[in-house]
Amino acid sequence: MIKLIWCEDLNHGIAKNNQIPWKIDEELNHFHQTTTNHPIIMGYNTYLAMNKILANQANIVISKKHQRELKNKNELFLYSDLKKALIDFSIVDLFIIGGKKTIEQAIKYADQLVISKLNADYGCDLFVNLNYDDFSLVQTKEYDQFVVEYWERKPNTKKPEDLIEELNINLNDDFLNLSFKHFSGPFDLLLHLIKDKKMDIMALDLFELTNQYFAYINKHMINLDLVSDYLYMACELLRIKSDLSIPNFEDETKIDLNNDDERDRIVKRIIEYKRYSELLPSLQKMQLERFSLFAKEEDDWDVFKLTSNDLLEAPLPDYVNPKKLKKAMERVFEKLKIKTITEHKIVIEELSIEDVKNEILSIIKKLLNNQYDRFIDLEKIFEQIDPKKLNLRYFVTSFVCLLILVREQKIDLNQKNDDESISACLVDPTKIVNSQESIQEVIQRQQEDEKALKESIKQIQEERKQSFFKQREEYLKKKYGEYYVSREQYQKLTPEEKINIRINQRKIDEQEKLNKAKAQNLVDENNQIIDLKTKKPSAKQILYEADLIIKQLDDLINDQQEDYDSQAELEALHTDLIKLDDEQEQDLIKEE
């Protein structure tokens, strides 16, 4: 059963600055009494806020980002996914204690809620907002400073289907049902009760357990895998009880009856066993599927390595198309009724490319009588091959061999039309053109190609640059008209002429911006008129649009005023510069 337990203040707050802002001993005792001997699941921040490991229970931390940080904490169970932790610990009652994100994710899986509600506000900055529609309040318990509410899931509500199937634990009633004075049930349940300390191992009669175990294995129908696994667990229980029963006089402090290391070790092994038992059907299915497949052994790649007689970068002739060759060979094999392999298990001899290549070449020479001016169809070539050899492996190998023979210039392949079959002929050795390049020539040709490519790229970039400057110059001439000057001309101007040019160009820029704004306003107004014609506006819309028009008029007046102000400033600056030049000239005349 999955249970959620947390404490909240009057405003549903659960934490402040990632810490619990209250310290109420009575509420803390209630938490320990409720969760002791049960696994607890928490988020990373909750683990930091606790600042300790709770004893007598499995501490499970859910975190994706802090796996390395907590990896050496052997007393913790680390999970990156809440759902996986719920599945692994689904055989026992567990509690989820926080924080906010973990509680909100887990409530859809919860069977019971235990909420401690405080009577005061503690100024929290972290709150839980949950929907309790799927739960009903079944019990309340009042304390001095808080009230505990117990909620249970309504019978007509369901958990998410994906988790229900995985949490559906079916204990096999036929497998080793035990019966003792204080216990009756399967071995699975016994281990879980001892694991959760719901049953004292010292009160367990291991002799009676062993007798019942041997009585079970004496039956005819048993599962040896399950029997051996549970026998191992029984031996572990026997060892634990022996360690607790026999005192160690050499070191009296060595045996600690409250130590949970052994219990935690058994818990981990049970979880590990459960994982493998769940994976076993899938592994068996994969094993059966693998038996129905056959693998191709590794080829000898030495036959594909280049030798001194091989041509470097030798292309196939223009009239040879591997795709057409493949289609032609498929038609040949269809006629020979060799389409697919239907047997699942067959014994295959390793095919050598060299042997198949020599076989095909010898058949071609035999059919053509070593004549170089005759052609033979592929269909006739493969009719000479032993039918027992014709299968998919031989088809693929022969396809590669034909390409190799063409590359080695031993045969030629020709096809007049796409629908016709491909014909083969022998190549006259005296007419073979040796187009092989030396290594130095290949390297030199590659270097020249790289150099030509760089020069071509550089030339293209320069052309683009000149084209850009030319387009920019034409644009500026069209924009500024008589006030346009080139860079060279601008450097030759006097300061007064430069200022005059700048003032006029700024006026043109501002006028252009103003024209664009007016044009956009006209477009917007036309769009609004069209919208008004197609859709009757409400009174509220009319008032809103009137306010918008008034605001646009105000902005237009302000912009016009700014234009006047800027123009006045520029003219004043121009006047000051002229006065400054006049004063400098008068000073020079006086000095002379």
Swiss-Prot record:
Query: Where is it localised?
Result: Cytoplasm
- The reply to whether ATP-binding figures as a keyword in the UniProt entry is no
Location of the DHFR domain = 1-155
**ScpA: region residues:** 156-592
| PANTHER family named among the record's database cross-references | SEGREGATION AND CONDENSATION PROTEIN A
What is the annotated quaternary arrangement, including any partners? Component of a cohesin-like complex composed of ScpA, ScpB and the Smc homodimer, in which ScpA and ScpB bind to the head domain of Smc. The presence of the three proteins is required for the association of the complex with DNA.
Identification of the protein by name: Segregation and condensation protein A
Q: Which species expresses this protein natively?
A: Mycoplasmoides gallisepticum (strain R(low / passage 15 / clone 2)) (Mycoplasma gallisepticum)
Q: Which gene encodes it?
A: scpA
